[in-house]
């Protein structure tokens, strides 16, 4: 489902591209919908924004292993770039050459002199992997190709640029980590209603039927006026009520919870269960709790509390 956060992420990345930023970070808690935004929306929305194909490689980070595994690092990027010989036996130098040539080819397909690399799960990147990426960036620069690296990372990654600089990787931080922006969850009832309206209007099931998810799955309730968007306030209250005690994180709710709860309730209604019963406050609370919402938000709270404590210690130092 499309969200305000996805729109904001695409607009932010578009602005960074316009400003010729070499690298930046989108950060947010786990399960808030970052990977879904990258996998299902980023390419199409960037292409719409620029009125044509945008050369984009999305790599969900996989650890390359030991410090000598640069060849495996290149193989992972070759596979993400759609190279047909990504897994063929080659020396690290040969793989590096193949990768640079592939990226030059993709940049040319975009009709420009730039390529976008999106690294999902970037919090797992090691310093040596960042250094290997710097080398690739430099090789492309010599070919007059601008490589723009956007990292999609978990919340704790926010402090990584300073940590990288202090660890001797200032040139990495300066090249790829000078800008950052948060990826929010669902924050208001209006935002939630917008997302849930996607079940009513912005979807199709079965494919080619012309019916939305709600109409296709629950035709009788739909005919009787049932709409998922009308349930936004009830779901928001259920998510708020399920926050852990002394919650210290942002008032942002994950798309994982929203999708799980909506799917559960919609399928119950579709099965013939009583609509009023399945959309009661108690039913929404159960749907939220059973999706692991409280545990997930406890993790968000703990991370936020640790970051807050770290900032306070730094301020007293």
What are these regions (language model features)?
Residues 80-81, 186-187, 194-208:
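Conserved AAA+ ATPase "sensor/coupling" helix adjacent to the nucleotide-binding pocket
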Residues 163-185:
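A short helix-turn-beta junction within AAA+ P-loop NTPase domains corresponding to the substrate/partner-engaging
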Residues 17-43:
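Walker A/P-loop nucleotide-binding motif
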